[in-house]
């Protein structure tokens, strides 16, 4: 699996940790080992621009996902095919504020948001209550098992 992590934000992040999380999540969801994923950390002005351009919403947001090849989770006996999963774009400065409100570290918030973004790339959504429950339960399970294995 090819995971590229780039930091264009003023906040220091452990790029290797986010690449490891991505590998873990994609392995757990049986995504083809040759799938490509990009994780990009940006500053507030860049995130505001992306948020307005792609979501028609003003101001920055915490995470945006840009799917490419519409890959879906596979199964033990049938992993997904290879392809370009897409891009997850995160704003550490927005995440830091959310982390303060939630009472945990910025890194934990960014790991949560990265997991959330990857699930969106795989077709998960939270527009409806049942979808939200499924996505957030899976997100929590994946993140907790990743953190427990560190």
UniProtKB/Swiss-Prot annotation:
NCBIfam families associated with the record: rRNA maturation RNase YbeY (TIGR00043)
Task of the protein: Single strand-specific metallo-endoribonuclease involved in late-stage 70S ribosome quality control and in maturation of the 3' terminus of the 16S rRNA.
Family: Belongs to the endoribonuclease YbeY family.
Name of the protein in its database record: Endoribonuclease YbeY
Sorted UniProt keywords: Cytoplasm, Endonuclease, Hydrolase, Metal-binding, Nuclease, Ribosome biogenesis, rRNA processing, Zinc
Highest taxon of the lineage: Bacteria
The EC number(s) this enzyme carries: 3.1.-.-
Binding site for Zn(2+): 116, 120, 126
GO terms of biological process kind: rRNA processing
Location relative to the cell: Cytoplasm
Gene (name only): ybeY
Free-text cofactor note: Binds 1 zinc ion.
One of the record's GO molecular function terms: RNA endonuclease activity
Keyword Zinc appears in the UniProt entry: yes
Keyword match Glycosyltransferase: no
InterPro entries in the record: MetalPrtase_cat_dom_sf_prd, YbeY, YbeY_CS
One Pfam family in the UniProt entry: YbeY
UniProt xrefs under Gene3D superfamilies: Metalloproteases ('zincins'), catalytic domain (3.40.390.30)
Cofactor(s) this protein requires: Zn(2+)
GO cellular component: cytoplasm
């Amino acid at each position: 699996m090819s995971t590229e992590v780039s930091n264009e934000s003023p906040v220091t992040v452990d790029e290797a940790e986010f690449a490891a999380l991505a590998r873990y999540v994609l392995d757990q969801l049986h995504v083809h080992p040759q799938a490509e994923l990009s994780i990009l950390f940006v500053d507030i002005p860049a995130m505001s621009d992306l948020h307005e351009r792609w979501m028609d919403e003003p101001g920055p947001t915490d995470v945006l996902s840009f799917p490419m090849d519409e890959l879906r989770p596979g199964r033990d006996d049938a992993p997904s095919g290879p392809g370009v999963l897409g891009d997850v774009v995160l704003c550490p400065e927005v995440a830091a504020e959310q982390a303060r409100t939630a009472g945990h570290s910025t890194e934990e918030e960014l790991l949560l948001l990265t997991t959330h973004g990857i699930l969106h790339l795989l077709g998960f959504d939270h527009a409806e209550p049942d979808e939200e429950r499924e996505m957030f339960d899976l997100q929590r399970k994946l993140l907790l098992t990743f953190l427990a294995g560190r």
